[in-house]
Amino acid sequence: MSKRESSKYKIDRRMGENIWGRPKSPVNRREYGPGQHGQRRKSKLSDFGVQLRAKQKLKGYYGDIREKQFRAIFAEASRRKGDTPENLIGLLESRLDAIVYRAKFVPTVFAARQFVNHGHVKVNGVRVNIGSYRCKAGDVIEVKEKSKQLVSVLESVQLAERDVPDYIEADHNKMVATFVRVPALTDVPYPVVMEPHLVVEFYSR
């Protein structure tokens, strides 16, 4: 595994879980953490430790979002009417980089952020280069014409390890996707269990 590939899986190793369901994840080959002490029996986590781990896993899944930004997303989820854990997931799945990843225009969520930042994506016909840009139901996301033949894009749409969820409609011939609706937690195809209610408990201490 190259240094670049290894860095992409540091979150998997830290969590001890294959959080993106990738075939090459190092945790597929071992059930212990990284480092020389990784094979020691894991001690039972405290309530705080469990909550912290849930937060780190959710942050990591969306490209290791910075704490300040993630806290701001949580704060908005808390202010909104309805269930805070559901609001949190809805806000995360509404991010432009998350939608580009879900639509299979790129192979990883990290690649999605870079792809957006480099100006390869339009929303409703306007170029947007901010990965955290929040999309609304009905928004149309498209890959710029000159970017459609990039090797990473052509390879990504062929990935068999994940499907496009039903809250996104994707046309891989035209490289266009529509964000149909904001999903509920149960709609999101996480390869591992995500526990946003524990994130709420963490920030509510």
Swiss-Prot record:
Q: Which residues form the S4 RNA-binding domain?
A: 94-157
InterPro entries xref list: Ribosomal_uS4, Ribosomal_uS4_bac-type, Ribosomal_uS4_CS, Ribosomal_uS4_N, S4_RNA-bd, S4_RNA-bd_sf
Q: What cellular-component terms does GO give this entry? A: small ribosomal subunit
Tell me one GO molecular function of this protein.
Answer: structural constituent of ribosome
Which residues does the annotated region (Disordered) include?
1-46
Tell me which Gene3D superfamilies the record gives.
Answer: Ribosomal Protein S4 Delta 41, Chain A, domain 1 (1.10.1050.10), RNA-binding S4 domain (3.10.290.10)
The record ties this protein, via PROSITE patterns, to: RIBOSOMAL_S4, S4
Entry annotated with the keyword Cell membrane: no
Q: Which SMART domains match?
A: Ribosomal_S4, S4
What UniProt keywords are attached to this protein's entry?
Answer: Ribonucleoprotein, Ribosomal protein, RNA-binding, rRNA-binding
The family classification in the record reads: Belongs to the universal ribosomal protein uS4 family.
Matching HAMAP family:
Ribosomal_uS4_B (MF_01306_B)
Q: How does it assemble?
A: Part of the 30S ribosomal subunit. Contacts protein S5. The interaction surface between S4 and S5 is involved in control of translational fidelity.
Q: What does this protein do?
A: One of the primary rRNA binding proteins, it binds directly to 16S rRNA where it nucleates assembly of the body of the 30S subunit. With S5 and S12 plays an important role in translational accuracy.
Q: What is this protein called?
A: Small ribosomal subunit protein uS4
- As recorded in Swiss-Prot or TrEMBL, the protein's gene is named rpsD
